[in-house]
């Protein structure tokens, strides 16, 4: 092992050492990182580690960053008014997520933080005198979860009419944002509820916006058996469904996304993740149709390509090589054929 590899492994391990500490079942140290990286070809390892370390520096959300997020909410007059303590008497924090634990966890943390730091409790269930509802979550990817939750809330939970809904995310991928906001506004109009969306971090994956993109989206490659097989599968799906798809990105020579250390490294990194993701896609006998090398996604594509993780969990919209697999499974089992860096807690 070279000194640079060891330093990178230690740097990554230091960032993720408290990952899923609430589950208390694994030690995320430099040995853990070393096992993960050795699944990649030796010539790719230093770049994969370098770019992974960079992604974690930007988009791995520790508890301290979550507390900063709560303070930003408190200090934002458009959300909390000029007197947050008084405003809280008319605010309800929603816990309406149909699938997953991220909203409940965040609201619990916010309640605990405001009680300790502000000496005040929040309203989580009482509609009386409520003039504003707050929908809190860690990150918006496609927005489908948000839309399902709000549709169900409007249809079945009798929110107060003529109020306001503030949707607040730690992070937001903007590719579907305009469509989602339009759907929310239309649905909430049934109750006279106005909608505003806030985010702490915004990531560009909107094909109509200027480059660069803040997602992992590989350029073309044709020298890997698993990638070739997956691309062939994509072409077959296009023929069967009569639908188009989103394939490889075009080369880009402009200023690079801050998430990556260089354009050169980014290209190699994305291809490395694609190759391992395509291999992982080949493992299950009955693969979920949303399972794609660069992360779960609807439609015909290489995958969503997000990278956003908290100290509690990582999204399945991230490339499979980061999270797919089971640390406790043997190599003879399907889930034991890949060792994840950030194993995912399934919703």
Where are these regions (language model features)?
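PRPP-dependent phosphoribosyltransferase catalytic core
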Residues: 2-90, 100, 155, 161-347
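A glycine-rich, hydrophobic loop/mini-helix early in the fold
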Residues: 92, 96-105
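Structural motif
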Residues: 92, 132-134, 166
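Alpha-helical scaffold elements adjacent to nucleotide-binding pockets in ATP/GTP-utilizing enzyme cores
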Residues: 109, 149-152, 183
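Short helix-loop-beta junction
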Residues: 109-118
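Short acidic low-complexity segments
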Residues: 119-130
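Ser/Thr-glycine-rich phosphate-binding loops at phosphate-binding pockets of nucleotides
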Residues: 136-145
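A short secondary-structure junction signal
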Residues: 144-149, 178-181
């Amino acid at each position: 092992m070279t000194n640079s590899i060891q330093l990178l492994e230690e740097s990554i391990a230091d960032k993720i050492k408290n990952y899923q500490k609430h589950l208390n079942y694994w030690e995320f140290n430099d040995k853990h990182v070393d096992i993960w990286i050795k699944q990649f070809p030796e010539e790719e390892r230093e770049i994969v580690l370098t770019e992974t370390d960079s992604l974690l520096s930007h988009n791995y959300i520790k508890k301290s960053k979550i507390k900063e997020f709560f303070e930003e909410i408190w200090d934002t007059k458009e959300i909390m008014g000029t007197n947050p303590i008084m405003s809280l008497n008319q605010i309800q924090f929603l816990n309406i997520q149909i699938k997953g634990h991220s909203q409940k966890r965040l609201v619990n943390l916010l309640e605990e933080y405001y009680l300790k730091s502000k000496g005040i409790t929040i309203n989580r269930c009482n509609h009386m005198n409520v003039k504003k509802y707050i929908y809190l979550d860690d990150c918006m990817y496609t927005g489908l979860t948000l839309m399902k939750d709000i549709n169900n809330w409007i249809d079945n939970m009798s929110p107060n009419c003529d109020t306001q809904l503030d949707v607040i995310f730690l992070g937001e991928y903007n590719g579907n944002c305009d469509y989602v906001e339009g759907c929310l506004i239309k649905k909430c109009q049934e109750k006279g509820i106005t909608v505003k969306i806030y985010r702490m971090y915004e990531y560009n994956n909107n094909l109509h916006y200027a480059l660069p993109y803040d997602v992992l989206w590989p350029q073309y490659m044709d020298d890997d058996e698993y990638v070739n097989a997956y691309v062939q599968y994509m072409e077959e799906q296009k023929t069967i469904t009569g639908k188009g798809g989103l394939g490889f990105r075009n080369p880009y020579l402009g200023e690079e996304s801050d998430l990556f250390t260089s354009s050169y490294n980014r290209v190699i990194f994305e291809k490395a993740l694609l190759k391992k993701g395509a291999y992982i896609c080949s493992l299950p006998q009955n693969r979920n149709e949303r399972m794609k090398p660069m992360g779960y996604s609807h439609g015909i594509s290489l995958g969503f390509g997000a990278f956003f993780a908290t100290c509690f969990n990582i999204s399945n919209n991230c490339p499979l090589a980061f999270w797919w697999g089971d640390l406790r499974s043997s190599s003879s089992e399907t889930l034991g054929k890949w060792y994840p860096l950030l194993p995912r807690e399934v919703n």
